[in-house]
Amino acid sequence: MGGEVSNKTWVFKKSPSSLPEPGVHTAFEDRPLSLVAPPGGLVIKLLTAGLDPHQRDRMRGAGNVDYVPGYELDEPITNFSIAKVIRSDNDAFEEGSLIAGSLPIAEYGIIPKELIDARAMASPLVWKVSNNYNLDLKHYVGTLGLAGMTAWNSFYGLVKPVKGETIWINAASSSVGEVVVQLAKIEGMKVIASVSSDEKLDYVVNELGADVGFNYQKEPVGKALKRLAPDGLDVVFENVGGDHFQAAIENMKWFGRIISCGTASQYNKPVEEQYGVTNLSEIFRRRIKIQGFIFWDDNIYTDNIENFKATMPKWVSEGKIKSRYTQFEGIEQADKAFLSMFTGGSHGKTVLKISDP
């Protein structure tokens, strides 16, 4: 059964030097698609796409490989999404089943066998979703998807929680931060959370259970940390970079550990305008361990992913793990949704609902 459908697609057009401009750096194009599955592959209908700050880093262009490849010019922008299989030539994925993975943000897509078989280090790039608790599908691009796996694998694989230790989580209301806050409380840590608004502060303290927190727009980061952790920090879960990273180093205990998840404050700045950290000597003086990661790294993925799959859906269904979503409707809202992450317009995980199952 074949046929062809119109297929509105979000396309990468040009590398930006600051915030991407819709119509210049990205565009929507109708790229008609044949509804015939390639050998061993799939045709999918995209349901919900997740959007993440790290996508801005991928807009540097395909010639820059680093930790994940940059986006190809004139190709669909991809990210962690959930889709329905509408045509299949692969016995592992029957028609009507749900899949998640790194998918093109378009109304429809072709998933070749090569992508199904590919892996990013320890993790497959596409896998089947079993929604055993009948949860809203947006969870599978958030708490049960990239954000949740990032939080879980790094928390148990790198933070290695110790009851009673003090952890500072910045960008604590973000899709990753909110999960780390709750895992840290489950494991008996003292949690300091920082956010960019009073509304978000109320959320992380009164709903997620952080012990204390502060709004860095109202109180300098270093001053707040000295007030809330006068004896220093055991762990920092670092999402922001810039002055937050400097403050982390400045307030660490001896042999403290900084887990670097991202540098969201720096992604939209040219290199010459990025924050220059001036206290790097404190790393050796205080014997600080700094560890960057990607959720699929062998050293944290393999030992933790099965516990994540067995535990997190149950905790979400029970309300033990809470999350917030900022949802935009329709693929035409992709630019607005993406920019909202950098302009204060989103809270928690930013998702783009494209169609119903």
From Swiss-Prot:
Top EC class, one word: oxidoreductase
Q: How is it used?
A: Fusaric acid is phytotoxic to plants such as cotton and banana. It has been shown to induce programmed cell death in plants. In addition to a mild toxicity to animals, fusaric acid exhibits acanthamoebicidal, antioomycete, and antimycobacterial activities.
- GO molecular function list: oxidoreductase activity, acting on the CH-CH group of donors, NAD or NADP as acceptor
Task: Identify the EC number(s).
Answer: 1.-.-.-
Per the UniProt entry, the signal peptide is none
SUPFAM superfamilies to which the protein is assigned, alphabetical: GroES-like (SSF50129), NAD(P)-binding Rossmann-fold domains (SSF51735)
Give the record's keywords alphabetically: Oxidoreductase
Query: What pathway is this protein said to act in by its record?
Result: Mycotoxin biosynthesis
Question: What induces or represses its expression, per the UniProt entry?
Answer: Expression is positively regulated by the secondary metabolism regulator LAE1.
Pfam families from the UniProt entry: ADH_N_2, ADH_zinc_N
The highest taxon in the source lineage is: Eukaryota
Please report which protein family the annotation says this sequence is part of.
Belongs to the zinc-containing alcohol dehydrogenase family. Quinone oxidoreductase subfamily.
Sum up the protein's function in the record's words.
Answer: Dehydrogenase; part of the gene cluster that mediates the biosynthesis of fusaric acid, a mycotoxin with low to moderate toxicity to animals and humans, but with high phytotoxic properties. L-aspartate is suggested as fusaric acid amino acid precursor that is activated and further processed to O-acetyl-L-homoserine by cluster enzymes aspartate kinase FUB3 and homoserine O-acetyltransferase FUB5, as well as enzymes of the primary metabolism.
What's the protein here called? Dehydrogenase FUB6
Q: Which organism is it from?
A: Gibberella moniliformis (strain M3125 / FGSC 7600)
Tell me the organism's taxonomic lineage: Eukaryota, Fungi, Dikarya, Ascomycota, Pezizomycotina
